[in-house]
Amino acid sequence: MRVTDFSFELPESLIAHYPMPERSSCRLLSLDGPTGALTHGTFTDLLDKLNPGDLLVFNNTRVIPARLFGRKASGGKIEVLVERMLDDKRILAHIRASKAPKPGAELLLGDDESINATMTARHGALFEVEFNDQRSVLDILNSIGHMPLPPYIDRPDEDADRELYQTVYSEKPGAVAAPTAGLHFDEPLLEKLRAKGVEMAFVTLHVGAGTFQPVRVDTIEDHIMHSEYAEVPQDVVDAVLAAKARGNRVIAVGTTSVRSLESAAQAAKNDLIEPFFDDTQIFIYPGFQYKVVDALVTNFHLPESTLIMLVSAFAGYQHTMNAYKAAVEEKYRFFSYGDAMFITYNPQAINERVGE
C-alpha cells in the first residue's frame, strides 16, 4: 500500500484555527460502515445514535503545556517540545536549535529565561533534560510552558487554549496533543448520555508529538510507528466484556481510545481483552483485524496520516475516501479544532484491496 493512496485535496480555508463557541455544536458526519451511506447533522445527534447499554470509551489524558522557549547558556535560541515526563525532574524532549545542545549544556528556559536546566543525554532524535529547580516538572511546565497547538494551527497559543485544547473529563497529565474527538463532549451532553443509559469508561493514552510526524516512507508497511504510553485498567476490561456479553456496542471516542483498546486486545492471552499498562506502537492500517471497537467518534485527519489509515481500516478505504471527499465539498472544518465523524464498523473492510 502506498502512502499516496491516502492523499486528498484539502483547501486551507477548511482547517479550523479555533473551536466552535459551544463544544457540542460542531457538525457531525455519520458514516455507515457496511453501506458507506453518509448522514449530515450536528454533534448532539450522537444521543440518537447510541443505545442504552452501549459503552463509550474516552481517553482521560490531560495535555501539558509542553512547549518551552529559551536559549542555551552559550547563546543560541531554542524551542523545547516535551515528548514525555520521565519523573519529577526529567523530561524527554524534541529541541529545535540552530545547533543541537551537547550533553552537559546549560539551558535557560521560560519567556524570561528564569528556569535553569541541563541537557544530560541524547536518545536518537530526543534529548533528556533535567531541571535544576525545587519544583516538579509538572509545576514548572504549568508555570512557563505554552500549550502545544498542532503545527497546522498557524497561530501562537492563547490563554484560552489552556481550557479549549483540553477535554472536560481530562484527568491524568502527560499528553502533548489533545485526544481531539473528546473536545466535542460538554457536561450537558455527557449528562444526557448518562440519563439515556449509555455506559462510560476511561482509558489513558498520553499522546506524543509523534502523532504529528508525517509518514516518511512510500510504502506504509515500511513505516515505524512512534511509541506512546497507554493504560487500560481492569474496570475498562470489565465494562467492555459486559457490553459485548449483553449485545451492546463498544464505541471508541477518538483514535487514541481505539489504539488503547486494540493494543490491550492484541496483548491479551486468555480473553478478548485484558488489562494493559505499557508503551504501544500499534499501527492500524487496512487489513488490520479489529477485535473490540464497534463504532468510532473521530475528527477529520490529515492527508497521508496514520490516522486516516486507521479510519480506512475501520470503515473501508473506499467509504472513507468518499466520506472525506463529501466533507470537503460540504465544507466541514478539519483537524483538531474541527468537526467530527461517527463511524460504524465495516466487517468487509479487512478484505478490501487498496491502491490496486
Curated annotation (Swiss-Prot):
Pfam families: Queuosine_synth. GO terms for molecular function: S-adenosylmethionine:tRNA ribosyltransferase-isomerase activity. It is found in: Cytoplasm. Its EC number is 2.4.99.17. InterPro entries: QueA, QueA_dom1, QueA_dom2, QueA_sf. It catalyses: 7-aminomethyl-7-carbaguanosine(34) in tRNA + S-adenosyl-L-methionine = epoxyqueuosine(34) in tRNA + adenine + L-methionine + 2 H(+). Pathway: tRNA modification; tRNA-queuosine biosynthesis. SUPFAM superfamilies: QueA-like (SSF111337). It is an enzyme of class 2 (transferase). Belongs to the QueA family. Monomer. This is S-adenosylmethionine:tRNA ribosyltransferase-isomerase. It comes from Escherichia coli O6:K15:H31 (strain 536 / UPEC).
